[in-house]
Amino acid sequence: MSAIPQADPLSASKLSSLQRSVKVLVSALAVFLLTGGDRVSAKSPDLNETQLHARLADPASGLRDFVSLIEKSMITGEMSPVEELVDQQLILDRATDGIQIAGASTMKDLFSDSTRQSWQQTGITRDFAGTNFRFLRVRTFKNRAGLLFRCAGENHALNFFSFTLSEVGPRDYRITDIYTMGLNEYTSETLRRSYLHLAANLLGEEGRALTKDHGAFADSLDKVAAVSQLLKAGQWSEVLDACAALPPAVQNDRSVMLIRLQAAENYSVTSRAEVLEDWLKAYPDEMDLPLKLADHYLTQERWDDAERVVTTLLERTGGDARLQLQLGNINYRRDRDKLLMQTAAARN
């Protein structure tokens, strides 16, 4: 663990509390560190679109080989080659830099160490293992260019991920962040949210002022951790009940709503629909959860809403065969419903 800076003193009791809170927070939210912001000050070494296109077109650059390695690792489930290419420190720096409060340096060290330990146990790219993971094209999200991949898993699960890259030497690249289209968020943004909650819990009013809920989540940290444990145990009904008992501001926290959604998806169709409608009230931008909402609209036969979301996804990805197929299915089912209604009307 990194040495505790003398210029950033904390009492022994507060340090002990900090260590415990870091472990609780990272454990509670580890499931969303990928899938998982605020503007930060870390300098980005990302290659831009022009640079990425140029290297893809140049066989000597090695970028095509890099893409092939990623695809092979994901499909076979042999994740270690890709894990070694992730610049963990850069992601953590992007998530934690820019907070100038007494105690922040120590908090950053402990948060970073705990997060690395979590990654060592589970891996940053673990959710991709064994999926059909295919490179599509260079694409920019939130002003950061990257390599866009389509991820198709079991039960027709579909998502898209963009890997931002740095070039550390000839034919040598590192993954500097991962954008998840299904959540409209980079890994560093997910971590940033968790880090700010930790600041609110430990750094007094200055820390609380950094969060949108002014520390409400931090005040419920132990309860959120308990909910997370219920989720890991597969106690879906208990998770939903526990979330409903949280303060309103905490219920609407993005991470808590994702925990609630995961439980609802395993509990009942009705519960899932309720959570997604609550999500839309808290986060009206459909592109913050586009793939889940597209499926939600399809289930409810809200064809126009489903078409709107899928069409926007097609625009953002630059086109995709599976999304195009989904759009065709929407149009077919809508036309079928119209025909059935016309036939019924004619009979009457």
Q: What does each model-found stretch correspond to?
A:
Residues S255-R260, D288-D295, R322-Q326:
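Alpha-solenoid helical repeat scaffolds
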Residues G103, M107, F111, T115, ...:
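Long, contiguous interaction/recruitment modules in multidomain scaffold/adaptor proteins
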Residues S237-L246, T270-K281, D304-L314, D337-N348:
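Alpha-helical repeat scaffolds
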Residues V250-Q251, P284-D285, G318-G319, N348:
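Short coil turns that delineate tetratricopeptide repeat
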